[in-house]
């Protein structure tokens, strides 16, 4: 194939329509060097600004020389290049994580929104076979995605439909370690695939076909289940166990960087079935939150360094706090105004719950923890509930319960009213 053929493929696919700046992961191998040649030659036609990024893994004597040559290449092409050196104990997984962390840093620094890699069809076959041997979940056997959105960036693999033999022989660096069978991928490439192709000369096509078929099923299930609210457990549990598993797995596809193992997936299933309330980190910065018949998986929110101090409100004063207007003894007008009988003899304290909090109801003391459980108050609401306190005792849990003190105060000569209005925060 000629370079213009690759350009036409890129334009037809519209890989770069949404992007003005793209970072190319440049290893120096034939595939990435040819991709560099195509992208740098046709920057104008593709309407992109190209930025190069290279990781020197420091595993071969030649790697420092190759780094220098890539710097020269970038200078000749008048393109910026960012380079980082891997350090620490080497493994395939550590190196991959290091590369992608570095690429994201470069993208953040340059304002690029696309990361372009030179993965091709042969890489896809190796990846699917590796995952099959390791016993991965079915959805991952669809292989590497042609386009993949991760957070605010998009990873684009424009060579995924081409084999390495489709690329012309141009200047590149040959990694001699690829001929060694120390790493799993090398054993797949050098040993397992050639043996399997003896049994079926079209084995590579067969593997790619299976991957595409799994992807079709995955997309079809996502489309068919679009109107099912999986986070509603009553709805989820109305289906058979098998359908529940498929729906839950499809729901998890929304979080591409979560990557639960089979054991972790089974644990999530068990929590959804057995726990009434649950909030705990699960993996990769995500947490699982369950509140009775609802659950969600979301990124862990950063916590404030310090808890907000409690608020003290004096008689005949007003204050806006946590989305409410509190008016101590000064009437507020409106249909949605809450009124709580209080005493004007001392100030009112407004705060969130504390360990050991007790509410008096019908002459009986009840711990807030037990009250919340009995009333099935969701954990989020428990943590955000506002406590109104006077004389060292809880007068009211806003919108949830009041105690006998407020009823007694209603008939007291020193009584007044705390007026509360919901306002926009």
UniProtKB/Swiss-Prot annotation:
Any GO CC annotation of this UniProt entry: cytoplasm
Reaction catalysed by this enzyme: cytidine(34) in tRNA(Ile2) + L-lysine + ATP = lysidine(34) in tRNA(Ile2) + AMP + diphosphate + H(+)
Record-listed ATP binding positions: 27-32
A molecular function GO annotation: tRNA(Ile)-lysidine synthase activity
SMART domains: TilS_C (SM00977)
EC number: 6.3.4.19
SUPFAM superfamilies: Adenine nucleotide alpha hydrolases-like, PheT/TilS domain
GO process terms (BP): tRNA modification
Swiss-Prot/TrEMBL keywords: ATP-binding, Cytoplasm, Ligase, Nucleotide-binding, tRNA processing
Predominant location: cytoplasm
Subcellular location: Cytoplasm
The keyword Acyltransferase appears for this protein: no
Enzyme class (EC, first level): ligase
NCBIfam families in the record: lysidine_TilS_C, lysidine_TilS_N
Task performed by this protein: Ligates lysine onto the cytidine present at position 34 of the AUA codon-specific tRNA(Ile) that contains the anticodon CAU, in an ATP-dependent manner. Cytidine is converted to lysidine, thus changing the amino acid specificity of the tRNA from methionine to isoleucine.
Family: Belongs to the tRNA(Ile)-lysidine synthase family.
Family annotation (PANTHER family): TRNA(ILE)-LYSIDINE SYNTHASE-RELATED
Domain comment as written in the entry: The N-terminal region contains the highly conserved SGGXDS motif, predicted to be a P-loop motif involved in ATP binding.
HAMAP family in the cross-refs: tRNA_Ile_lys_synt
Protein known as: tRNA(Ile)-lysidine synthase
Gene: tilS
């Amino acid at each position: 194939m000629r370079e213009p053929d690759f350009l036409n493929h890129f334009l037809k696919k519209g890989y770069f329509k949404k992007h003005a700046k793209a970072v190319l992961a440049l290893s120096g191998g034939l595939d990435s060097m040819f991709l560099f040649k195509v992208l740098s030659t046709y920057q104008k036609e593709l309407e992109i600004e190209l930025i190069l990024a290279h990781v020197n893994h420091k595993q071969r004597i030649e790697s420092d020389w190759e780094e220098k040559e890539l710097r020269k290449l970038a200078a000749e092409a008048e393109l910026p290049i960012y380079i980082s050196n891997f350090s620490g104990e080497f493994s395939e997984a550590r190196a991959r994580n290091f590369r992608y962390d570095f690429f994201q840093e470069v993208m953040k620094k340059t304002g690029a929104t696309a990361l372009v890699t030179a993965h091709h069809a042969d890489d896809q076959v190796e990846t699917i076979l590796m995952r099959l041997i390791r016993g991965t979940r079915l959805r991952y056997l669809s292989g590497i995605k042609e386009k993949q959105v991760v957070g605010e960036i998009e990873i684009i693999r424009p060579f995924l439909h081409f084999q390495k033999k489709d690329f012309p022989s141009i200047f590149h660096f040959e990694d001699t370690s690829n001929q060694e069978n120390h790493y799993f991928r090398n054993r797949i490439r050098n040993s397992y695939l050639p043996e399997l192709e003896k049994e079926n000369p079209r084995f590579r096509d067969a593997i790619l076909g299976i991957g595409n078929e799994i992807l079709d099923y995955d997309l079809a299930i996502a489309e068919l289940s679009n109107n099912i609210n999986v986070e509603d457990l009553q709805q989820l549990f109305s289906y058979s166990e098998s359908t529940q598993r498929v729906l839950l797995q499809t729901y998890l596809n929304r979080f591409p960087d979560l990557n639960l193992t089979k054991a972790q997936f089974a644990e999530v299933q068990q929590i959804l079935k057995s726990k009434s309330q649950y909030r705990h980190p699960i993996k990769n910065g995500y947490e699982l939150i369950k509140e009775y018949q609802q659950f969600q998986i979301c990124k862990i929110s950063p916590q404030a360094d310090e808890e907000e101090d409690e608020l003290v409100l004096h008689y005949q004063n007003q204050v806006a706090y946590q989305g409410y207007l509190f008016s101590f003894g000064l009437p507020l007008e409106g249909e949605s105004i809450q009124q709580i009988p209080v005493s004007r003899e001392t100030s009112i304290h407004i705060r969130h719950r504390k360990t050991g909090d007790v509410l008096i109801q019908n002459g009986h003391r009840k711990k807030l923890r037990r009250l919340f459980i009995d009333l099935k108050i969701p954990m989020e609401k428990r943590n955000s509930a506002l406590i109104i306190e006077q004389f060292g005792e809880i007068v009211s849990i806003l919108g949830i319960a009041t105690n006998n003190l407020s009823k007694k105060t209603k008939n007291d000569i020193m009584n007044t009213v705390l007026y509360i209005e919901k306002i926009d925060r």
